[in-house]
């Protein structure tokens, strides 16, 4: 199982105080050093702990199969693209599988992944992606979140707006029966978006992977079978 952390739970690591480091930076560093999924990702060769979230989503919903076309929005540092590549058995020589990863930040090459360094909000991105896919996508996935400021309501709205834009993008590039996966933060304002998604997909589920930090309000919207 992807959430088997045997051997990854180490003794608690304390972070020494530093005048050059803010309290929030110290808290983030402490959390990273004591997070078993961070340690597991390092050993398993994944670029981020977020890889395990997508693995759990796949275990729950069985979304990925060989010979798929996938778009990964906001892909950096590439953890989700790595997982998708493994699950569909992508390789640089296999033309039946296509993964297009988009981000304004550069990511290192992943086998079977074509990286587009671009903001997906730009007007020409949709047509560019369709051309790169040579058709429509089976899955559009987004683990994007806005930079958090610690104010839950603001963080909720900002990430929800990203999800809405990813959803509108997905409607344009997904084939019928395609799937959409995206991160949202719970906060009350997501209901309107959920109604929109339910009108466009046959099945819509919420899922919180065990690899998602318990204190986080993040959940994943899993929309199956575009109408």
UniProtKB/Swiss-Prot annotation:
Q: Where is the active site?
A: 183
GO cellular component terms listed in the entry, alphabetical order: cytoplasm
Q: Which residues bind S-adenosyl-L-methionine?
A: 78, 80, 103, 119, 143
Cite the entry's keywords alphabetically: Cytoplasm, Methyltransferase, rRNA processing, S-adenosyl-L-methionine, Transferase
Q: Which domain of life is it from?
A: Bacteria
InterPro entries in alphabetical order: RNA_methyltr_RlmE (IPR050082), RNA_MeTrfase_FtsJ_dom (IPR002877), rRNA-MeTfrase_E (IPR015507), SAM-dependent_MTases_sf (IPR029063)
Explain the purpose of this protein.
Specifically methylates the uridine in position 2552 of 23S rRNA at the 2'-O position of the ribose in the fully assembled 50S ribosomal subunit.
The similarity comment for this entry is: Belongs to the class I-like SAM-binding methyltransferase superfamily. RNA methyltransferase RlmE family.
A Gene Ontology molecular function term for this protein is:
rRNA (uridine-2'-O-)-methyltransferase activity
Q: Which gene encodes it?
A: rlmE
Give the UniProt subcellular location, in the record's own words: Cytoplasm
What Gene3D superfamilies does this protein map onto? Vaccinia Virus protein VP39 (3.40.50.150)
Q: What is this protein called?
A: Ribosomal RNA large subunit methyltransferase E
Q: Give the chief site where it resides.
A: cytoplasm
- Name the PANTHER family for this protein: RIBOSOMAL RNA METHYLTRANSFERASE, RRNA METHYLTRANSFERASE 2, MITOCHONDRIAL
Q: What is its EC number?
A: 2.1.1.166
Record field: catalytic activity? uridine(2552) in 23S rRNA + S-adenosyl-L-methionine = 2'-O-methyluridine(2552) in 23S rRNA + S-adenosyl-L-homocysteine + H(+)
Query: Per the UniProt entry, what species is this protein from, by scientific name?
Result: Rickettsia conorii (strain ATCC VR-613 / Malish 7)
């Amino acid at each position: 199982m992807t959430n088997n952390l045997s051997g990854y739970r180490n003794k608690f690591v304390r972070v020494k105080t530093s005048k050059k480091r803010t309290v929030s930076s110290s808290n983030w560093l402490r959390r990273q050093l004591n997070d078993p999924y961070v340690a597991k990702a390092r050993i398993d060769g994944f670029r981020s702990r977020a890889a395990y979230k997508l693995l759990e989503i796949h275990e729950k919903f069985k979304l990925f199969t060989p010979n798929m076309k996938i778009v990964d929005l906001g892909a950096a540092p590439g953890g989700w693209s790595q997982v998708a590549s493994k699950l569909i058995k992508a390789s640089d020589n296999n033309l039946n599988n296509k993964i297009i990863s988009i981000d304004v930040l550069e990511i290192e090459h992943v086998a079977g992944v074509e990286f587009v360094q671009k903001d997906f909000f730009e007007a020409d991105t949709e047509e560019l992606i369709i051309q790169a896919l040579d058709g429509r996508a089976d899955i559009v996935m987004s683990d994007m979140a806005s930079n958090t400021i610690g104010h839950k309501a603001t963080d909720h709205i900002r990430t929800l707006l990203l999800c809405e834009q990813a959803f509108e993008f997905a409607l344009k590039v997904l084939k019928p029966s395609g799937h959409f996966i995206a991160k949202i933060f719970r906060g009350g304002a997501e209901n309107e978006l959920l109604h929109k998604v339910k009108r466009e997909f046959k099945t819509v589920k919420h899922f919180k992977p065990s690899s998602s930090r318990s204190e986080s309000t993040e959940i994943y919207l899993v929309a199956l079978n575009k109408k």
